Amino acid sequence: MKKILVVDDEKNITTLLRAFLEDTGRYQVRTENSGEAGYQTALQFHPDLILLDVMMGDLNGDGLADRIKNDPLLRKTPIVFLTGIVTKKEVEENDGVIGGYPYIAKPILVLRELLDCIEANIRKSG
């Protein structure tokens, strides 16, 4: 079973994503509602992939991604950003990658797209 960490400051989003991903029977999911808590959980949980909100209060997604990529224990962990600051069209025009990271635009309207993105990025990482 693959491990996924969801970090988003909106509790309703983490709750929804956790329920959806766990219901597939393929993922063990942990959630956090702040960047700092997400980093600490990543160190302990060793996720196979991190779903990460871009805009958060204490430590935004870019800052957390930088910390993860500079940490020897976590640097190979794939990150997929969840964001409401780009449109689905912008994500598609950039082949789902902006700033070097794959993105999923919120709201996530087609959950199958999320699963496909998760699986593709876990496969890429090894």
Model-found features: residue ranges?
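His-Asp phosphorelay/catalytic-motif detector in bacterial-type signaling
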Residues: 46-48, 73-78
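Two-component/phosphorelay signaling modules centered on CheY-like receiver
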Residues: 11-30
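Active-site beta3 strand of CheY-like receiver
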Residues: 45-51, 56
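Helix N-cap/capping motif at the beta->alpha junctions
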Residues: 31-40, 61
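Alpha4 helix (beta4-alpha4-beta5 surface) of REC/receiver domains from two-component response regulators
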Residues: 63, 86-120
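Conserved sequence signature across two-component system core domains
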Residues: 7-8, 32, 50
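The feature encodes the CheY-like receiver
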Residues: 57-58, 66, 75, 87
